[in-house]
Amino acid sequence: MFTVLGRVMNRHCALRAHSRIRMPTPMKVSSLLPLPHNLLRTYATEKHDMDELNKSTDYMHIQNILLQKEKELSTKHTLLKEATGFYDRFKINTKWFLIRGNRPFSFDELSTLFSWLIISQIIWVILGTTTFVSLVLFTFNTVFAKEMVGKFVGNTLNKYIDSCDVEFQDALVPEWKKGCIRFRSVKVRTVTDGKSDVPSDQLQFDLKFNQVDITLSVRKWMTGHGLIDNLTVLGMHGKVVLNDVNENKLVGWFSNPEYHLGAVKVCDSCFTLRDGNQDYRISIYNMDMNRLRFEWCVSDFFNANVVTGAINHSLFTIHKRQHKLAYLQDLEKDLSPWKRITRLRLDRISVKDLGLDKSSSFNWIEEGSVEIIADLMLPNVEDESQDSDEEKNNKYMVMDLKFNFRDLKAKFPESAPTLSNGETVISFDELKPIINYINNRRVIFNSVATTETIDPDWNRITPVSIKRQKSYPDTTVIPTSVTWPDGEDEVQINKEIIKYHDQPTTNTNNLILKCRIVKNIDELQNVALFRESGVYDVLAMELYVDLMKIVEEWEFKKKNSWMRLWGTTLASQLLIFGLGAMV
């Protein structure tokens, strides 16, 4: 303490002594003049003296720094000249860069270096997880056998994935250009063990992947959303089995239902899906998704950029609906609060391939085909921390569906159609008119088609010359003032004089059903299968409502036309009898 006070007093006295002497500047070293020793100075003179003192002090400080740096450089150059090898020169340069000297490191300096090393590694792992793991795998592949590394990674994954067996046949190859880790010839299959509480019987699969590219993220792993960030699958094939062994949802099969994946891409894949007693051959040509969250599987799947594939060789597409008009910025605002409108289209597929004849809701359908077009309006579903007021107000999903059935054939079922919970959708008495309507339409259209396609023998007989005039013309002559009913062609050439009473006006036996379904988006949370949301039951009831309206309208028209025909016939007969009695 006294030492510090002594230094301060000495410096104060030195400054007072220097204030009485005019210090020379660098440019005026030779012109040094003595100052008058007057004791009374003005304020301006004292200020001028202080400026000169500051200049001289800065000059001396700069000179001291330059001398110190020159001494350090000379010491560094001297040490480098005395070094005998690369290790000595590297040691001198490293110490001079870190501590500006050649002395041994102190304990504080070593602890600081160690702390910075740990922090830098943590930052590297967090920001460049994929690169870090790629270097580790590349090092292991170089040092050890590639098969050993594949088995080691497979065994490691099997410890953390319940009821699954992962096997790598080829080596692990880091893809430096794409910034991902590439696995080749990967096999994933489910195994049954009694140690796990997961209902493994609910989902079983045996899949093979030609190539799998993944990127890792420690930040996602620290938040509990899984280590894998982006996933790309090429050449997947195998078999998947879904079993309704209990009432648990499929999302409970995953050990971490909150697993979040980033970009997911699947290309050139084909697998067989067995759902109950029905087999589906599903091909995925291209699937590009921005994200895939296990708790929002259905929502993220329908919000995919594009999904193209086939179900039992019938093409299907999922994409953003294209507008007929120009897509302006104002139109995008009109579409809010929905994220976008997704168009789902499934080309014509047999009802047997789709499994409608085996379903409990439409067990009366025997043959036919169907084409499905659906527009899905899904709201924005973000994380809870990112929810806005607009997203909270809109919590409903709207689906506009159109089913185009063609050439249906119905049968009387053994049991009444029911929903998934066992409730009856429609009774036998209400189902009879529907079956009669569908089968009558099929018979009429098949009869008309047969009549148009068959060329009878009497049409090929050469005409016989008879002088007697025919009692009826070959074609029906219609005056121009007569207008055709709605639905019939305006040009009536070579039409039959005698026709079926209920002959159809179109050439195709199509039955079009439309409906709109509104569903709360919260009901799609923690749902991995679309049928688990209850949409199928609502869809079945809406289709039956529309179908019954069509049948009632057909029965009314048929009854009305018969009554009109009967009344006209009776009136004409009475008129003829009356005229005959008068004559």
Curated annotation (Swiss-Prot):
GO cellular component, one term: mitochondrial inner membrane
Spans traversing the lipid bilayer: 118-138, 563-583
Compartments, as annotated in UniProt: Mitochondrion inner membrane
First-listed, main subcellular location of the protein, grouped into a coarse class: mitochondrion
Domain of life from the UniProt record: Eukaryota
Residue numbers on the Mitochondrial intermembrane membrane side: 139-562
Transmembrane helix listed as a keyword: yes
Organelle targeting peptide span: 1-43
Membrane topology type: Multi-pass membrane protein
Mitochondrial matrix compartment segments: 44-117
Biological process annotations from GO: mitochondrion inheritance; mitochondrion organization
Pfam family, one: MDM31_MDM32
Key words, A-Z: Membrane, Mitochondrion, Mitochondrion inner membrane, Transit peptide, Transmembrane, Transmembrane helix
Function: Involved in the organization of the mitochondrial membranes and the global structure of the mitochondria. Also required for mitochondrial distribution and mobility as well as for the maintenance of mitochondrial DNA nucleoids structures.
Family: Belongs to the MDM31/MDM32 family.
Protein name as it appears in the record: Mitochondrial distribution and morphology protein 32
Source organism (scientific name): Kluyveromyces lactis (strain ATCC 8585 / CBS 2359 / DSM 70799 / NBRC 1267 / NRRL Y-1140 / WM37) (Yeast)
Name of the gene this protein is made from: MDM32
